[in-house]
Amino acid sequence: MVCEEREPLRTYTEKNSPVYQDSAVEAFFQFEPKGSYSPVYLNFEANANGALLAGYGAARTYRSYFTEAEYREFDCKAEISDDRWAVNLRIPLHILEHIYGSLSLKEGDTFSFNLYKISETAEIEHYASFSPILTSTPTFHVPEFFATAVLTRA
């Protein structure tokens, strides 16, 4: 994800830190194993230091977290330039299948997602989403407002 922002707030450097208090980007994903609905979704939140907060579950509370080995496989990296910053990470299929069971993903398959920009720090507090969220207070943990993505060849 690329964020057009100069001098992002980036306090946290360790995994599982509350990076949403910094200037952060977030990606949420939800897959359906073999066409059956699963309420479980994944969230990946990162700041411009590459500090990653990631979890999965069916609701905002009682999230499950990834192992140290899984965090290494995500290989979250951040880059900062004059007027923007970017975060890259990868999500190995075997980690998705550990959560959802066999997915047998192929070109043309779909999944649900949303992308966010956030900071909960009062001086720079802001919230934005790719797919609109129709709630009275900002919250990103609402799969009913996720968009649909289609898998294509890279």
What do these predicted ranges mean?
Residues M1-A154:
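Structural preference for beta-rich elements and adjacent junctions enriched in aromatics
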